Amino acid sequence: MAILQTFSEQTISSARASDIKEPDYSVNSRPEICFFLNGIMEEKSLISLYLARDSHSAILSSILAVDPQQKLLIMDYGINETLNQIALKRGYLRCITSHNQIRIEFDCDNLQRVQFEGRHAFSADIPESLKRLQRRNFYRVTTSITNPAVCTIPLLRAADEAPVVYSLLDISCGGMALIDQPDADTLLKAGTTLEHCRIDLPGDGNLFSSIEASIQIAYVGTVILNNGNTCPRIGCEFINLPEKSRLLIQRYITKLEQQARKLETESGF
């Protein structure tokens, strides 16, 4: 089931954006494009379907089928019908996902609603080109729901009050996304720089590692979960992250990937 992900206008242009700009190259061969799309489908990777190039609103979806003969791409339908109708009226989607830890971007035209295996789905033309963003250092991985990583942020409240603790939605060596309580007015604001934030990365029942980092809030938006709850989503960028901390995060990401592959093997997928 697709998840609606909506970001507010509280997005900042970071002065460090050029430092993390990723090299890329375009794929224009139809067979090679289909190869990548099939790989994304087999990995069951989520895709962010943006309504426009400069949009902050996206539907989280996945690829259901790739049909080279009909030149069609079939993707999961969104849970928010209003947003679905806006997308169908525009007939265009900007798609962002990952394949083998490489960020993938492509555009889809001629968007339509179809029936696929007894349910609604999006149909679009197979893209004419596909862009691969090569830098692996900032590969983002979704954290565990059952054993979540948490970020403790001091200095948001008075000295005699407990610090604020947020669960992580995802993490990379370049930053992380936090989630607040449903329908909460988050204390975090775009553009704010926070120091001495502690990030606890759990392992198998024990603490995997704990790091301290300075962060800048890149955006504050909302995410609508599968259960219908609307929660603040806070995108953060690490500032001058020490090499030791970066390595700990990379090891944690590797551990999560190993766990995911193990679950896929055990479930037969």
UniProtKB/Swiss-Prot annotation:
MF GO annotations: cyclic-di-GMP binding
Keyword Cell wall biogenesis/degradation: no
Cellular localisation: Bacterial flagellum basal body
The keyword Nucleotide-binding belongs to this UniProt entry's keyword annotation: yes
PilZ domain: residues covered: 134-254
Keywords: Bacterial flagellum, c-di-GMP, Nucleotide-binding
Taxonomy, superkingdom: Bacteria
Major localization listed first in the record, in broad terms: other
Any Pfam family the entry gives: PilZ
Signal peptide (UniProt feature, chain positions): none
One GO CC annotation: bacterial-type flagellum basal body
Family matches, as InterPro entries: PilZ_domain, Split_barrel_FMN-bd, T3SS_YcgR, T3SS_YcgR_PilZN
Biological-process GO terms, alphabetical: bacterial-type flagellum-dependent cell motility; regulation of bacterial-type flagellum-dependent cell motility by regulation of motor speed
Family in the record: Belongs to the YcgR family.
Record text on subunit structure and interactions: Monomer. Interacts with the flagellar basal bodies.
Entry function: Acts as a flagellar brake, regulating swimming and swarming in a bis-(3'-5') cyclic diguanylic acid (c-di-GMP)-dependent manner. Binds 1 c-di-GMP dimer per subunit. Increasing levels of c-di-GMP lead to decreased motility.
This protein's name: Flagellar brake protein YcgR
